[in-house]
Regions:
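Short, highly charged low-complexity linear segments
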Residues: 117-121, 133-136, 157-162
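N-terminal beta1-alpha1-beta2 submodule of the flavodoxin-like/Rossmannoid cofactor-binding fold
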Residues: 1-85, 138-163
Protein backbone atom coordinates (compact mmCIF):
# COMPACT_ATOMS: atom_id res chain seq x y z
CA UNK A 1 0.00 0.00 0.00
CA UNK A 2 3.01 2.27 0.32
CA UNK A 3 4.45 3.57 -2.94
CA UNK A 4 7.81 2.31 -4.17
CA UNK A 5 9.26 5.75 -3.45
CA UNK A 6 9.10 4.78 0.22
CA UNK A 7 11.85 2.22 0.77
CA UNK A 8 11.04 -0.37 3.42
CA UNK A 9 13.05 -2.88 5.40
CA UNK A 10 11.37 -5.62 7.40
CA UNK A 11 12.96 -6.72 10.66
CA UNK A 12 11.42 -9.58 12.61
CA UNK A 13 11.61 -9.64 16.39
CA UNK A 14 9.45 -12.71 16.84
CA UNK A 15 12.08 -15.43 16.74
CA UNK A 16 13.02 -15.00 20.40
CA UNK A 17 16.61 -13.89 19.81
CA UNK A 18 16.10 -10.41 21.22
CA UNK A 19 17.82 -10.20 24.57
CA UNK A 20 16.34 -7.55 26.84
CA UNK A 21 18.38 -4.77 28.37
CA UNK A 22 19.72 -5.62 31.80
CA UNK A 23 20.23 -2.04 32.87
CA UNK A 24 23.81 -0.96 32.32
CA UNK A 25 24.65 2.32 33.98
CA UNK A 26 24.15 5.37 31.79
CA UNK A 27 27.91 5.75 31.47
CA UNK A 28 28.41 2.14 30.38
CA UNK A 29 25.51 2.30 27.92
CA UNK A 30 26.90 5.51 26.42
CA UNK A 31 30.41 4.03 26.23
CA UNK A 32 29.21 1.06 24.19
CA UNK A 33 26.80 3.20 22.13
CA UNK A 34 29.60 5.58 21.12
CA UNK A 35 31.31 2.56 19.58
CA UNK A 36 28.15 1.62 17.71
CA UNK A 37 27.39 -1.40 19.84
CA UNK A 38 25.56 -2.57 22.92
CA UNK A 39 27.01 -4.70 25.70
CA UNK A 40 24.40 -7.40 24.96
CA UNK A 41 25.09 -7.51 21.19
CA UNK A 42 23.03 -9.78 18.99
CA UNK A 43 20.43 -8.93 16.37
CA UNK A 44 19.49 -5.66 18.05
CA UNK A 45 23.03 -4.31 17.74
CA UNK A 46 23.71 -5.83 14.33
CA UNK A 47 20.40 -5.19 12.54
CA UNK A 48 17.75 -3.32 14.49
CA UNK A 49 19.57 -0.26 15.85
CA UNK A 50 21.40 0.47 12.56
CA UNK A 51 18.08 0.21 10.68
CA UNK A 52 16.36 2.59 13.09
CA UNK A 53 19.28 5.00 12.87
CA UNK A 54 19.03 5.10 9.07
CA UNK A 55 15.22 5.22 8.90
CA UNK A 56 13.01 8.27 8.67
CA UNK A 57 10.15 6.27 10.15
CA UNK A 58 9.38 3.03 11.97
CA UNK A 59 6.18 1.03 11.61
CA UNK A 60 5.61 -1.33 14.53
CA UNK A 61 3.31 -4.34 14.21
CA UNK A 62 2.06 -5.04 17.71
CA UNK A 63 -0.15 -8.00 18.53
CA UNK A 64 -1.82 -7.60 21.90
CA UNK A 65 -0.48 -10.15 24.38
CA UNK A 66 -2.58 -9.90 27.54
CA UNK A 67 -3.05 -6.14 27.13
CA UNK A 68 0.66 -5.54 26.50
CA UNK A 69 3.18 -5.51 23.67
CA UNK A 70 5.19 -8.68 23.22
CA UNK A 71 8.28 -9.38 25.32
CA UNK A 72 10.45 -8.90 22.22
CA UNK A 73 8.86 -5.51 21.52
CA UNK A 74 9.47 -4.50 25.13
CA UNK A 75 13.09 -5.60 24.73
CA UNK A 76 13.31 -3.49 21.55
CA UNK A 77 11.97 -0.44 23.41
CA UNK A 78 14.47 -0.99 26.21
CA UNK A 79 17.46 -1.66 23.97
CA UNK A 80 16.63 1.43 21.87
CA UNK A 81 18.05 3.42 24.77
CA UNK A 82 21.49 2.41 23.45
CA UNK A 83 20.83 4.47 20.32
CA UNK A 84 19.01 7.27 22.11
CA UNK A 85 21.93 8.06 24.44
CA UNK A 86 24.15 9.07 21.51
CA UNK A 87 21.62 10.21 18.92
CA UNK A 88 18.39 12.11 19.40
CA UNK A 89 15.36 10.33 17.96
CA UNK A 90 13.19 13.43 17.72
CA UNK A 91 13.33 13.30 13.90
CA UNK A 92 12.00 9.73 13.67
CA UNK A 93 8.33 9.11 12.94
CA UNK A 94 6.61 6.12 14.52
CA UNK A 95 3.40 4.40 13.45
CA UNK A 96 1.89 1.22 14.85
CA UNK A 97 -0.66 -1.40 13.92
CA UNK A 98 -2.19 -3.08 16.97
CA UNK A 99 -4.25 -6.26 16.66
CA UNK A 100 -6.24 -7.47 19.67
CA UNK A 101 -8.49 -10.44 20.29
CA UNK A 102 -11.26 -8.64 22.15
CA UNK A 103 -9.98 -5.55 23.93
CA UNK A 104 -6.87 -3.80 25.13
CA UNK A 105 -5.72 -2.21 21.88
CA UNK A 106 -5.76 1.16 23.60
CA UNK A 107 -3.42 -0.17 26.31
CA UNK A 108 -0.93 -1.42 23.73
CA UNK A 109 -1.13 1.89 21.83
CA UNK A 110 -0.37 3.71 25.09
CA UNK A 111 2.71 1.53 25.60
CA UNK A 112 3.95 2.50 22.14
CA UNK A 113 3.24 6.16 22.92
CA UNK A 114 5.03 5.97 26.26
CA UNK A 115 8.06 4.07 25.01
CA UNK A 116 8.62 5.77 21.68
CA UNK A 117 7.37 9.33 22.21
CA UNK A 118 7.54 10.14 25.89
CA UNK A 119 10.65 8.08 26.69
CA UNK A 120 12.61 8.11 23.41
CA UNK A 121 11.27 11.45 22.03
CA UNK A 122 10.26 10.10 18.61
CA UNK A 123 7.38 11.72 16.69
CA UNK A 124 3.98 10.06 16.84
CA UNK A 125 1.86 11.82 14.21
CA UNK A 126 -1.90 12.27 14.59
CA UNK A 127 -3.65 8.90 14.28
CA UNK A 128 -0.30 7.11 14.57
CA UNK A 129 -1.99 3.85 15.46
CA UNK A 130 -4.33 1.57 13.52
CA UNK A 131 -6.34 -0.62 15.89
CA UNK A 132 -7.95 -3.85 14.67
CA UNK A 133 -9.87 -6.58 16.47
CA UNK A 134 -9.28 -10.14 15.32
CA UNK A 135 -10.22 -13.15 17.40
CA UNK A 136 -8.64 -15.85 15.23
CA UNK A 137 -5.36 -16.16 13.31
CA UNK A 138 -5.73 -14.46 9.93
CA UNK A 139 -8.99 -12.77 10.90
CA UNK A 140 -7.48 -9.27 10.81
CA UNK A 141 -6.87 -9.57 7.07
CA UNK A 142 -10.50 -10.57 6.55
CA UNK A 143 -12.08 -7.97 8.85
CA UNK A 144 -14.79 -5.69 7.53
CA UNK A 145 -13.42 -2.54 5.86
CA UNK A 146 -9.82 -3.49 6.70
CA UNK A 147 -8.70 -2.64 3.17
CA UNK A 148 -10.12 0.86 3.44
CA UNK A 149 -8.59 1.31 6.91
CA UNK A 150 -5.19 0.24 5.60
CA UNK A 151 -5.48 2.57 2.60
CA UNK A 152 -6.27 5.55 4.86
CA UNK A 153 -3.48 4.58 7.26
CA UNK A 154 -0.94 4.20 4.43
CA UNK A 155 -2.02 7.54 2.95
CA UNK A 156 -1.39 9.27 6.28
CA UNK A 157 2.13 7.80 6.33
CA UNK A 158 2.80 8.91 2.76
CA UNK A 159 1.36 12.38 3.36
CA UNK A 160 3.62 12.79 6.39
CA UNK A 161 6.82 11.47 4.85
CA UNK A 162 6.33 12.88 1.34
CA UNK A 163 4.45 16.18 1.81
Amino acid sequence: RLPQSIRTQEILLQNGTVQDCRGCSYEACRHFAEGGRCFYGGAVTEQVLPAVQQADAVLLLCPNYNDAVSANMTAFFNRLTNLAVVRELWDKYVWAVVVSGFSGSDLVARQVLGAMCLNKAAILPPRFCLLQTANDPGAAAEAENVGTKLDVFAKSIVDTLLP
